[in-house]
Amino acid sequence: MGQKVNPIGLRIGIIRDWESRWYAEKDYADLLHEDLKIREYLTKRLSDAAVSRIEIERAANRVNITIHTAKPGMVIGKGGSEVEALRKALNELTGKRVHINIVEIKKPDLEAKLVAENIARQIENRVSFRRAQKQAIQRTMRAGAKGIKTMVSGRLGGADIARSEHYSEGTVPLHTLRADIDYATAEADTTYGKIGVKVWIYRGEVLPTKKKTEEGGN
């Protein structure tokens, strides 16, 4: 079933960690909805800032947000003006003290989210879906990936019947749990309707750290 399941969810607790890290009992549902609002707001506001991942941590009445972006300058703004405006807006949205960390992505071509969004934007700009996929694959392999698979689905080229087409290069071992596979989806809004984009990137193997347990007497 490795072909069907989300590769990131399958690896949580093995080589991946949760993107929201906090504990709650009776307030769990409210905090979960708050997380969704924060992610929705940041995704919309930073749509041009090449944001790959948003991590949320909570402690008492404080929210720590880590934004992974390929364009940190756009998120921070001139003299930190943009990130300060962002913090104030999130303070109002959540009613809590918000602290924002910015992490720069050194190799954006190895981030599935950014590759998928790039393919989607090209399709919206009437670039051939085949060309968009092949160019993305070449860039990702040049950046040092071990393998990549891309898939687009919908009314490709304005066809009457929706279909899917995928391209791949290298290996993408979905069943190997120690394989570091990044996966993401994106949507392209065209005059013929939405076209879905999926990207899997294999970045090499990660050996999970084993917790050493000391046995009494040894």
Swiss-Prot record:
GO molecular function: mRNA binding; rRNA binding; structural constituent of ribosome
Annotated InterPro entries: KH_dom, KH_dom-like_a/b, KH_dom_type_2, KH_sf_prok-type, Ribosomal_S3_C_sf, Ribosomal_uS3_bac-typ, Ribosomal_uS3_C, Ribosomal_uS3_CS
Biological process according to GO: translation
Stored SMART domains: KH
Swiss-Prot/TrEMBL keywords: Ribonucleoprotein, Ribosomal protein, RNA-binding, rRNA-binding
Cellular compartments per GO CC: cytosolic small ribosomal subunit
Coiled coil: none
Residue ranges occupied by any KH type-2 domain in the UniProt entry: 38-106
Keyword check for Transmembrane helix: no
Top-level taxon: Bacteria
Family: Belongs to the universal ribosomal protein uS3 family.
Subunit architecture: Part of the 30S ribosomal subunit. Forms a tight complex with proteins S10 and S14.
Role this protein plays: Binds the lower part of the 30S subunit head. Binds mRNA in the 70S ribosome, positioning it for translation.
Protein name: Small ribosomal subunit protein uS3
Naturally occurring in which organism (per UniProt): Anoxybacillus flavithermus (strain DSM 21510 / WK1)
The organism's taxonomic lineage, starting at the top: Bacteria, Bacillati, Bacillota, Bacilli, Bacillales
